[in-house]
UniProtKB/Swiss-Prot annotation:
It is found in: Endoplasmic reticulum membrane. SMART domains: Elp3. This is Threonylcarbamoyladenosine tRNA methylthiotransferase. The lineage of its organism: Eukaryota, Metazoa, Chordata, Craniata, Vertebrata. [4Fe-4S] cluster 1 binds at C73, C109, C138. It is linked to Type 2 diabetes mellitus: A multifactorial disorder of glucose homeostasis caused by a lack of sensitivity to insulin. Affected individuals usually have an obese body habitus and manifestations of a metabolic syndrome characterized by diabetes, insulin resistance, hypertension and hypertriglyceridemia. The disease results in long-term complications that affect the eyes, kidneys, nerves, and blood vessels. The gene is CDKAL1. GO terms for molecular function: 4 iron, 4 sulfur cluster binding; metal ion binding; N6-threonylcarbomyladenosine methylthiotransferase activity; tRNA (N(6)-L-threonylcarbamoyladenosine(37)-C(2))-methylthiotransferase. Residues 431-493 form the TRAM domain. It comes from Homo sapiens.
Amino acid sequence: MPSASCDTLLDDIEDIVSQEDSKPQDRHFVRKDVVPKVRRRNTQKYLQEEENSPPSDSTIPGIQKIWIRTWGCSHNNSDGEYMAGQLAAYGYKITENASDADLWLLNSCTVKNPAEDHFRNSIKKAQEENKKIVLAGCVPQAQPRQDYLKGLSIIGVQQIDRVVEVVEETIKGHSVRLLGQKKDNGRRLGGARLDLPKIRKNPLIEIISINTGCLNACTYCKTKHARGNLASYPIDELVDRAKQSFQEGVCEIWLTSEDTGAYGRDIGTNLPTLLWKLVEVIPEGAMLRLGMTNPPYILEHLEEMAKILNHPRVYAFLHIPVQSASDSVLMEMKREYCVADFKRVVDFLKEKVPGITIATDIICGFPGETDQDFQETVKLVEEYKFPSLFINQFYPRPGTPAAKMEQVPAQVKKQRTKDLSRVFHSYSPYDHKIGERQQVLVTEESFDSKFYVAHNQFYEQVLVPKNPAFMGKMVEVDIYESGKHFMKGQPVSDAKVYTPSISKPLAKGEVSGLTKDFRNGLGNQLSSGSHTSAASQCDSASSRMVLPMPRLHQDCALRMSVGLALLGLLFAFFVKVYN
């Protein structure tokens, strides 16, 4: 996957409600009409006023349907899964039907202009259809003051554990913004807790963000404005998340971040140390895939990384963006490495990890790129014949240094993108593998629904027949055909389908991270189509699990206090009346 999405605006941080207003969940319980009326009133006049008053627009949050759309990288997708899980755990129904939804949660990507254009168009469409809207992701985090975001609720990339509160207030008609950073004693944290409820898009694949932000300051990157500087999760929290995932039937874990290679530098550890700890808890038959890493940081750990990538439960795959094969262009990008560094990493890993798949990214038409610069990039692709290559035409992102540089003409950028794409499609990376027998892990269905999609040890895509017995299993296949991006494999007739030593996966759309009792109750509730109020859900849920709302138990205690206070008032009132 390309690293497609990856700042703080202190004066835009707003609390969900003001101090004078009651907390969102309190409003379900503190109702003005339960306060005793001591003074007599003219009943006829009162009824007439009631008849002439405008109709009530009262809305009880926690029973609406929500449609979630996510653009961008695997980190963004993980955030979207977490938000879906929390909303479902609270009682909202997550729907795949946008027109049927009461609220749209749009989780954006700021890497390229087209992604933001799609995001903006979706906002416009939601407004035309009178949908409630909550915005998330890197676009509103990086530029919350854009005109087309005015009046809309925003949840920041580090505040996704409060999505229920933001949605709740938005449904009530309020516009709220939460853009703060998670900190502990002044130290920036990786983000929301990893043990929050989640709905995995694919129940077999767990995406774990090991850190957020990065250590670089690339001149073209808008993601830095949203995700900020490096902040890593502790190793024990990541290992616990992996263990929980395997207990829920996951058979493949993706480690993601804006730069996995920089992991741990802010907390006194490093990527190899984390990977060795994770390898210890991966069940046989399950696999680990490492996400994008920039050349400067992996250079320090080449020996250890080679050993890890040779491990049978780790895909021999690494995504290392080069962006350009011209040192002068890399300098203008502030990439903090030269082409020789990139080649050293790739050459070393190819030697020490036979068959490894190296994926890379290239930007065509960066400001100042000459024809000679571009030809150097073409030569690099011709030399290494990358089986996975993400070619991106340069788009100047607002507020970045590169946007202020002298731009390459649009037509030149387009032509260079086409030329490099032609080079990429001139070779066939998998033809020589026809006839091989491979072990593949089956994890999903193809887009055309004709095959199941599996991956071999090198994370190369292998299409296999749609046999339900294969899903989530290790299957032995003979490769009989290849294309530009895939191979096709025929299962060996006498080979045993290997079942990983893990639990049965959750059903599609099922919430992870919940206790068994709570999950069963939630499933019964959603399947019957009946929804209790947010208040009753809080009462039932709090006895079984800790929901991802920091005020939950405080609210329950507050409700009890309010109830007792009201009883006291009623008692005092009747004592006074009858005395």
